[in-house]
């Protein structure tokens, strides 16, 4: 084969690997965030305190469950 064809094959392979790597990394990050949201009950409690609310445990857990539920439904609707 000529050198030009080899160079084109290498460029196509690199581009395919780049696109595939980005796709796989994106799926893994979405899965990780869906399973373990970055907003924890402690962070919600702190935000409520800063807004002047007295955070009851029931309200904190309700807010946290709503956030987790929303994140999971957002991922499912993307698919």
From Swiss-Prot:
- State the name under which the record lists this protein: UPF0154 protein SAK_1616
Provenance organism? Streptococcus agalactiae serotype Ia (strain ATCC 27591 / A909 / CDC SS700)
- State the organism's lineage: Bacteria, Bacillati, Bacillota, Bacilli, Lactobacillales
InterPro entries, alphabetically? Answer: UPF0154 (IPR005359)
Which HAMAP family does the UniProt record give? UPF0154 (MF_00363)
Any GO CC annotation of this UniProt entry: plasma membrane
One Pfam family for this entry, by name?
UPF0154
For the keyword Transmembrane helix, the answer is: yes
Cellular compartment(s): Cell membrane
Topology term for the membrane: Single-pass membrane protein
Task: Give the residue spans that cross the bilayer.
Answer: 5-25
Keyword terms, alphabetized:
Cell membrane, Membrane, Transmembrane, Transmembrane helix
Asked if the keyword Transmembrane belongs to this entry, the reply reads yes
| Family the UniProt entry places it in | Belongs to the UPF0154 family.
